[in-house]
Amino acid sequence: MKNLIQFMTRVPIKGDFEKAREEVWMLPLLTPLTAFIPSLILYLNIPLKNVLSILSLYWVIGLLHLDGLADWADGIMVKGDREKKVRAMKDVNTGIAGTFAVVMILLIQVYSLFSAPFYSIYLAELNSKMAMLLALATKKPLGEGLGKYFMDKLTTKRVFLGGVLYALLLIPILLYDPQSIFALLGLVGGIYAVKISLDNFGGLNGDCIGAVGEITRGATLLILGVWA
């Protein structure tokens, strides 16, 4: 688990990158770590809790996935064939589509927390991690890179075990508030992002996986914010 923590978060822990892909099925298990501080901020109801909660979240998980969302959006929005879209996604310069996507996902998260319950960031992170795991489970890599690197070691058994972890981490919140079951709808956003990626690029790379995680978290918070 420490290897996955070292790669997927900014927590200062030593890990082996080569072993991280052996632990990728444990992605949902990162949620208590990544969502603890943001959830605590919301629970304590301190001033500017919405902004501070999101800032603390990215302080823990870093900006890698957010950067992936920007690249993904640039590729999705460009007109042309798959080759042109992939080239736009891999361009080191962020375009207007990428900037717009990042700004929108941040605004959605911050403003959703005005009405969403304190545990919503936990559910959003849990969904985000599960959606990323499901994206990797497609086994449809886009060339060589991080996407293929993690897909290669992800078996059906490991995906199932990841699903079990997801369920076990979800149950306590469902017992606390049965209406939180609606958070599951947030996964639809991630699944749709996977479909868009496959339709536009023909596969998934690290940018696509990061975008799936960000979109799923934003969709979950939006649903919980509206439902509340």
UniProtKB/Swiss-Prot annotation:
<keyword id="KW-1133">Transmembrane helix</keyword>
<feature type="transmembrane region" description="Helical">
    <location>
        <begin position="159"/>
        <end position="176"/>
    </location>
</feature>
<dbReference type="Pfam" id="PF02654">
    <property type="entry name" value="CobS"/>
</dbReference>
<keyword id="KW-0808">Transferase</keyword>
<comment type="similarity">
    <text>Belongs to the CobS family.</text>
</comment>
<dbReference type="GO" id="GO:0051073">
    <property type="term" value="F:adenosylcobinamide-GDP ribazoletransferase activity"/>
</dbReference>
<comment type="pathway">
    <text>Cofactor biosynthesis; adenosylcobalamin biosynthesis; adenosylcobalamin from cob(II)yrinate a,c-diamide: step 7/7.</text>
</comment>
<dbReference type="GO" id="GO:0005886">
    <property type="term" value="C:plasma membrane"/>
</dbReference>
<protein>
    <recommendedName>
        <fullName>Adenosylcobinamide-GDP ribazoletransferase</fullName>
        <ecNumber>2.7.8.26</ecNumber>
    </recommendedName>
</protein>
<feature type="transmembrane region" description="Helical">
    <location>
        <begin position="50"/>
        <end position="70"/>
    </location>
</feature>
<keyword id="KW-0460">Magnesium</keyword>
<dbReference type="InterPro" id="IPR003805">
    <property type="entry name" value="CobS"/>
</dbReference>
<keyword id="KW-0169">Cobalamin biosynthesis</keyword>
<feature type="transmembrane region" description="Helical">
    <location>
        <begin position="24"/>
        <end position="44"/>
    </location>
</feature>
<comment type="function">
    <text>Joins adenosylcobinamide-GDP and alpha-ribazole to generate adenosylcobalamin (Ado-cobalamin). Also synthesizes adenosylcobalamin 5'-phosphate from adenosylcobinamide-GDP and alpha-ribazole 5'-phosphate.</text>
</comment>
<feature type="transmembrane region" description="Helical">
    <location>
        <begin position="117"/>
        <end position="137"/>
    </location>
</feature>
<feature type="transmembrane region" description="Helical">
    <location>
        <begin position="96"/>
        <end position="116"/>
    </location>
</feature>
<keyword id="KW-0472">Membrane</keyword>
<dbReference type="GO" id="GO:0009236">
    <property type="term" value="P:cobalamin biosynthetic process"/>
</dbReference>
<keyword id="KW-0812">Transmembrane</keyword>
<keyword id="KW-1003">Cell membrane</keyword>
<dbReference type="GO" id="GO:0008818">
    <property type="term" value="F:cobalamin 5'-phosphate synthase activity"/>
</dbReference>
<feature type="transmembrane region" description="Helical">
    <location>
        <begin position="181"/>
        <end position="198"/>
    </location>
</feature>
